[in-house]
C-alpha cells in the first residue's frame, strides 16, 4: 500500500516565530534572528498581516505575509515579501511601495537589495486591514528590540 505524506501550512500562530533573538546589518542589508522558525506562521484570516519590521536610516522595511494581493515580487502574497513603508502616529500605513527583496531561512529574516547604514529598531507585529476605512494598522506588537 502506498502512503502519501501531505504537509500543510501552519494554521496557528506560533509567537516564537516572532520573538527576536538578535538583529543587525550586513553589507547594507538589515537582518534579524527569531527564536522560532522565521516565516513559520502565516496569517489565515484574509484581513491579517504578519510582519518583521526594520527601522533604518533609509526608511522602514517590512517583510510581510498576508492573503490579499499587493505586489509582483511574489506569486502569492502569503509568501514573505518586502515593502518599504511609512506608518503614521496611529501606526497605520500611509505610504507603501515595493522596495527590497526578501530572504527567510531557518531563524533568519533579511531584507536584501537595499542600502542602509544602520538599524535603530526592529519589531515583529500583526497588522489588520480595516475594509470600512481602507486602512491597515498595527494591532499587536509581538516583540521589539532594542
Where are these regions (language model features)?
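Surface-exposed, glycine/proline- and aromatic-rich loop segments on solvent-exposed faces
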Residues: 12-84
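Beta-strand secondary-structure signal
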Residues: 29-33, 110-112, 126
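Short helix-loop boundary/capping segments
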Residues: 88-107, 112
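Surface-exposed, acidic/Ser/Thr-rich flexible loop segments
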Residues: 55-57, 101-103, 108, 117-119
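Beta-strand elements of well-folded, non-transmembrane domains
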Residues: 36-38, 88, 117
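Short, solvent-exposed, Trp/other aromatic-anchored flexible loops in extracytoplasmic proteins
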Residues: 81-83, 87, 113-116
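Acidic/polar low-complexity flexible segments
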Residues: 118-146
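N-terminal low-complexity, Pro/Thr/Ser-rich intrinsically disordered segments
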Residues: 1-11
Amino acid at each position: 500500500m502506498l502512503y502519501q505524506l501531505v504537509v500543510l501550512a501552519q494554521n496557528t500562530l506560533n509567537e516564537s516565530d516572532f520573538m527576536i533573538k538578535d538583529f543587525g546589518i550586513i553589507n547594507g542589508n538589515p537582518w534579524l534572528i527569531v527564536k522560532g522558525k522565521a516565516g513559520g506562521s502565516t496569517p489565515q484570516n484574509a484581513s491579517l498581516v504578519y510582519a518583521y519590521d526594520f527601522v533604518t536610516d533609509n526608511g522602514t522595511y517590512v517583510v510581510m505575509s498576508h492573503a490579499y494581493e499587493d505586489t509582483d515580487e511574489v506569486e502569492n502574497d502569503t509568501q514573505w515579501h518586502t515593502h518599504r513603508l511609512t506608518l503614521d502616529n496611529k501606526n497605520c500605513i500611509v505610504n507603501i511601495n515595493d522596495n527590497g527583496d526578501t530572504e527567510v531561512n531557518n531563524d533568519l529574516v533579511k531584507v536584501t537589495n537595499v542600502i542602509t547604514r544602520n538599524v535603530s529598531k526592529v519589531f515583529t507585529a500583526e497588522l489588520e486591514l480595516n475594509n470600512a476605512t481602507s486602512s491597515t494598522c498595527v494591532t499587536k506588537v509581538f516583540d521589539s528590540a532594542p
